[in-house]
Structures are given as C-alpha cells and as structure tokens.
Amino acid sequence: MIRLDKIKIVSSIDYIKIIDKNRFDIHYKENDVVSYKFTQLQPFLLYVEANIKNQELIIEFTGKILRDNYPSLINRINIKNCLLSINEIGSCLLDVDNILIRGEVVKVDVTQDVPYPDCGELTKMIQANISNFRKYLPRIINRNFTIEKNVVTKSYKCRLTVYDKNKELKRVENKLFLSQLLDKQKLLNYFESKVRFEMNLNSKEQIRKALHITDLSVDSVLSANVNPIWEFLDQILVDADSTDITAKCDDLKELLRGALLQVCDYDIKKVEAQLRLHSSP
C-alpha cells in the first residue's frame, strides 16, 4: 500500500463551505473576489484554496495532520480522517465524501521509513554506487541527501530524498508539532534509527509514470500496487557483483540488509549487535 507524507487534491469548489472568512486571505481582481486562501505552516502544513475563477477547490496537507498516528503516514485507510481533521479546525467545512470520490491527485510525496542504524553511512554507499552522475545528480538540499534525475522535461523529473527522520523531527521547526502530541516520546522512539526515503512527484504525469496508473482519483493513487522508491533506486544504482550492496536485492529491505552487512564486514555477530543497540525498548 502506497504511503504519503504529502498530498495535493484538486476538486470542485462546490465541495467547500467557508465558515470563517477572517481566517482566509481574500484575493480580488478589480472589485471581484477571485479566491479564498487558507495557509497554515505549523504544527503541520495545510493549504486550502477556493478558486472562484476556476471553480476549483485545492487542498494540500502533510502527514503530520495525523498527529500521534503520524508513523502510519497518509494512506488509503486514513485519508478520510485526514480530511475530517481539516473540518475540525473550524475555518471551513469540506464535503469529504465527494472530494474522495471526485477529487484528482496532482502532487504527492511517496514515503517509506526503513530501520537502519546509520543514515550517513547508507547515503554514502548509495552515492558511491550511482551508475551515471550526469543522469542522476546527488546533492545536499536543506541538510538532506537527494538524488534528482537530470532532465529538462518536467514530466520526467524525479527526486528522491534520504534522511534521518528522528533527527529531522527534533529540529526547532517541529517543536510545536511535538508539543501537541499525546505521547511525544513514543513517536520519537518509533523513528529512532529510521531512514526516510521520500520521492517527490510534483505533476500529474510524474504520478502516472511512477505509480503505473492512468486514473488520478484519490482511491486509484492510494491503491497503487507498486514501490516507486525501489524502482528508482533500481534504475540509478550500478549492476554489481555478489558482494555489492545492490546485488540481487528484491526490494528496499533487501538493499538495506545488504548495506548493514557491508557496514559490519559481513560479520553476523556484528550485525546482531547493531540491531540490539538500535532496537526500540
């Protein structure tokens, strides 16, 4: 099941009722209102726009809307609760059922959190095994390791970000989010020694290509039965012999198991010690 840390949905303006106009930025063209925009950056990103000119409702939010259930990320099971949580804020009332049926997904961050003890070591190994540095550009953006497909055409662009999720949560910008949780420590413990792989798909065509779908309905996107993160890694990493971390890996977990073995010099006792050291109590 696909899991997302961000989703953007476009639907009909008929599916929103603005309750508190004072919480929206009202945009005019001459004397006519053309849109209402609600933007929230903390404790989680939320953007709601009622575009009168285009008769569209635009909703964008991140997985932190799930609060204590954030580890589950946005998925097919909890997407309705995510939208209902927007209604609980009190600035607008969304017709959740119609949005889920008739909305179109136009942007997503496909996400996978994987247990691994050393994010820095893992990203070094991934970078060392990139097959073509002209085609795939590794770089550091906002303190995170990224690999981007170096193409001009937007529909073919793809960016994968790899970072230590526990460290990211402890940054100052997440202080308000953590303060509103029922059990902050439980969430931090969950993300201890977790490496996050996050693929940014910022256009309809990118989503179609990465998820192997033609229909961009909410259900179609969240029901996609593929792992685009692994497929991207499979494209960018070199073919290697049996001792290389990328050799004959069937899925992302196998890749990380191989990386752990390589870090521990293929010594099973060292592997077991690392797992005990970084396992949650």
Question: Which ranges hold each PLM region?
Answer:
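Structured, helix-rich domain cores that form ligand/interaction pockets
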Residues: 1-278
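Helix-turn-helix DNA-binding segment
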Residues: 281
